């Protein structure tokens, strides 16, 4: 069963969660009462977000949608650009770094160089700037990354993600739990995806969770799981091709991660070698020379003649920008890409939902083309 585990809360912080909840509920009511104005747009706007802080898989799901539609439409991704060193609206180009636009937008621009990637904390301003582009560059569809709480923009399709190991229905408001807003905010979602499922999901899990989240008639429920790709050299051409399946049982791996939920990645690598040393940093950690020294010290402690460093794609974005990395890393440093797949043979149904939504919106507003 998917949710057979215990979620820990800080009970001492419960009074603060109560006060936080009052503020968030009042803000949501202001939007519901139309005191705060929500902007609507003619073109398709797909929001991918969640109710919680921490990793639910927004980036791989956003990339899944990009991969699905990029050859059919002109696609733009608009993100806040979390922890970037710039401000205001910025349209990414091939010279942009993770410091300029943030880890996730940088990763998406590297993977999909032909799409538009923009960052702006003010999503309305960001959309206005994208729609002000020349007609041959103007997007047909905008994907909003992590904007479920940004209610100043009304998406035409709202996709809500929830980790199967920590459903929002079982969580509590910040700071005692991880909820950004009360769970009834899920009513704004058109699609709910239960993420990070095990490959052995059973139909009974679908029914239990469907009842647990009280799915509304207008909502669709999907389950997805993480799919790991092949190891990729962080510095192209500097390291030999390697695969997880090809690792010898004696291979030693130093796993370096600065993401919200590193446990699934650790579990995956342990399938191929027992010799895994983990260095865990906070989510979106800005690596500095002291961290590099710490990683180098840990790497030198590995005694096998077959050893490598594995990092996530997001961490690779930050490490690439650092000067003076140890030379020996260039032939030992790999990142492990991830994608998502849908469970219970519903992948085609999800794809059709996305494409039909976009086609319908564009057909109803042909001027967009």
From Swiss-Prot:
EC number: 2.7.1.130
An example Gene Ontology CC term for this record: plasma membrane
Origin superkingdom: Bacteria
GO BP annotations, alphabetical order: lipid A biosynthetic process; lipopolysaccharide core region biosynthetic process
PANTHER family: TETRAACYLDISACCHARIDE 4'-KINASE, TETRAACYLDISACCHARIDE 4'-KINASE, MITOCHONDRIAL-RELATED
InterPro entries the record matches: LpxK, P-loop_NTPase
Catalytic activity reported: a lipid A disaccharide + ATP = a lipid IVA + ADP + H(+)
Cited Pfam families: LpxK
Sorted UniProt keywords: ATP-binding, Kinase, Lipid A biosynthesis, Lipid biosynthesis, Lipid metabolism, Nucleotide-binding, Transferase
Key word GTP-binding present: no
Gene behind the chain: lpxK
GO molecular function, one term: tetraacyldisaccharide 4'-kinase activity
Family assignment from sequence similarity: Belongs to the LpxK family.
Pathway: Glycolipid biosynthesis; lipid IV(A) biosynthesis; lipid IV(A) from (3R)-3-hydroxytetradecanoyl-[acyl-carrier-protein] and UDP-N-acetyl-alpha-D-glucosamine: step 6/6
Name by which UniProt lists this protein: Tetraacyldisaccharide 4'-kinase
Entry annotated with the keyword Lipid metabolism: yes
Annotated binding of ATP, by residue: 52-59
Function: Transfers the gamma-phosphate of ATP to the 4'-position of a tetraacyldisaccharide 1-phosphate intermediate (termed DS-1-P) to form tetraacyldisaccharide 1,4'-bis-phosphate (lipid IVA).
């Amino acid at each position: 069963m998917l949710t057979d585990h215990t979620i820990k809360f800080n009970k001492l912080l419960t009074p603060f969660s109560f006060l936080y909840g009052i503020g968030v509920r009042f803000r949501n009511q202001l939007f519901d009462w139309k005191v705060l104005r929500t902007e609507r747009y003619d073109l398709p706007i797909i929001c991918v977000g969640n109710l919680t802080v921490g990793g639910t898989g927004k980036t791989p799901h956003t990339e899944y949608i990009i991969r699905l539609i990029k050859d059919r439409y002109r696609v733009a991704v608009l993100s806040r650009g979390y922890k970037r060193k710039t401000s205001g609206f910025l349209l990414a180009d091939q010279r942009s770094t993770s410091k300029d636009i943030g880890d996730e937008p940088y990763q998406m621009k590297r993977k999909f160089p032909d799409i538009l990637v923009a960052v702006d904390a003010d999503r309305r301003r960001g959309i206005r700037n994208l729609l002000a582009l020349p007609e041959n560059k103007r997007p047909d569809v905008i994907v909003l990354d992590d904007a479920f709480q940004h209610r100043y923009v009304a998406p035409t399709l709202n996709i809500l993600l929830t980790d199967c190991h920590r459903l929002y229905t079982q969580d509590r408001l910040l700071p005692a739990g991880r909820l950004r807003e009360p769970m009834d905010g899920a009513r704004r979602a058109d699609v709910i995806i239960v993420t990070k499922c095990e490959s052995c999901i059973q139909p009974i899990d679908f029914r239990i969770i469907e009842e647990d989240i009280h799915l509304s008639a207008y909502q669709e429920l999907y389950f997805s799981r993480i799919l790991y790709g092949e190891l990729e050299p962080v510095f192209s051409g500097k390291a030999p091709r390697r695969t997880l399946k090809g690792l010898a049982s004696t291979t030693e791996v130093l796993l370096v991660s600065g993401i919200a939920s590193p446990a699934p990645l650790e579990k995956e690598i342990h399938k191929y070698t027992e010799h895994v040393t983990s260095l865990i940093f906070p989510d979106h950690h800005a690596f500095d020379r002291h961290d590099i020294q710490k990683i180098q010290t840990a790497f030198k402690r590995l005694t096998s003649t077959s050893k490598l460093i594995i990092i996530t794609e997001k961490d690779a974005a930050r490490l690439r920008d650092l000067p003076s990395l140890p030379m020996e890393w260039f032939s030992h440093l790999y990142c492990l890409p991830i994608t998502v797949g849908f469970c219970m043979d519903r992948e085609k149904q999800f794809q059709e939902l996305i494409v039909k939504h976009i086609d319908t919106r564009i057909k109803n507003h042909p001027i967009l083309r």
